[in-house]
Amino acid sequence: MKSAAVVNYAPEKGSVEIREIDKPEIGEEDVLLEVVNVGVCGSDLHQWTADHSWHVNYPVVLGHEFGGHIVALGSRVTGWKEGDRVVSETAAVIDPNSPMTKSGLYNLDPSRKGFGYGVNGAMTKYVRVPARCLHRVPDQLAFEQACLTEPCCVAFNAVVENSRLKPGDRVIVLGPGTIGILCAAMARLCGAEVAIVGLEADKHRLDIAK
């Protein structure tokens, strides 16, 4: 069975096209996810315009901010069932013996490969996902919002974990992109006074940020 996919097939600018790809085969610790929604990250655009700084395993299906329904499970997968609504983390391949992985910082594992550049991502119908990457999505939460889980985590890490804001702090966010707006939202949840600064071209985004 084949499905349409958004494929980044070469390092040259504009090397993205729709291709037919085979349905992925899963390993014993993987699930097969039927994709419902997938976000377009700035890194997807950078690969399209060929101004990225990371190694890409061409050809590769783009997309790493995604969610969907489990449609098949590997033989060693527990705690999940077909039909479960989930989102995925981005670290598709990690070394379990890496010091970073062992300390819980698997996102900093030097051998890490992410969806959309290291392995096939989710801009297609089906994607193979390690079960360790999954997080459950409540029934009342739409996938359009659930697919913002990864950028929300970026904002949480920046604002809550690293900046350690306190109620009453005053914060300026430079740039009303997705991450900037989410950082502003996190800062407000921490009790800070927040201002977002942008350019004239950002007027629509600043309106959204309000």
Residue ranges, per PLM feature:
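Cysteine-cluster motifs in flexible loop/terminal segments that predominantly coordinate metals
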Residues: 41, 80, 90-135
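Cytochrome P450 core scaffold surrounding the K-helix E-X-X-R motif
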Residues: 43-49
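Glycine/charged-rich beta-loop-alpha catalytic/anionic-binding loops adjacent to active sites
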Residues: 133-143
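Cofactor-binding loop segments of dinucleotide-utilizing enzymes, especially the Rossmann-like FAD-
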Residues: 10, 36, 73, 176, ...
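Glycine-rich beta-strand-centered segment in the early N-terminal region that forms part
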Residues: 24-38, 51-97, 138-140
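Mid-domain Rossmann-like dinucleotide-binding core that forms the NAD(H)/NADP(H) cofactor-binding site
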Residues: 141-210
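Short structural boundary motif marking the start of a folded domain
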Residues: 1-6
